[in-house]
């Protein structure tokens, strides 16, 4: 399993390439082959122009792109995305959602988000977690948005589903 958390977990003292191939660095398996693979992944996430930069010179969106490349480097069948886009501006968020969807399309992905629109854009099935009450499940019923993700938010049925999700969230607060 690979994990892309809300806050990047990059190491500021490592190069961008070594952050991507962190597992290989930690276990002493770093090689010319893994370095090349890291460079290819950084190119896929649009970071090849920034290889010379230090961690401190990267924007929040750039750090998340590097973190996404590290997730891809792990080549896990299951990927947990834990609020990975929440700290980004609207444009970076949209671009990274699309990029992550494209690069992870052949993986099983569990997306944790507090953003109903994000869930509706990217998910095949949506569950709402809530504090369980006696004789009640912690999971809501499944919501299945129509169409292929990533979806455009101008679809009428998505607005209705967004309201349904908000109602589920409100119900869980009571």
Feature annotation, model-predicted:
Residues 93-105:
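Helical segment within the ABC ATPase nucleotide-binding domain
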Residues 54-58, 62:
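Conserved ABC ATPase signature
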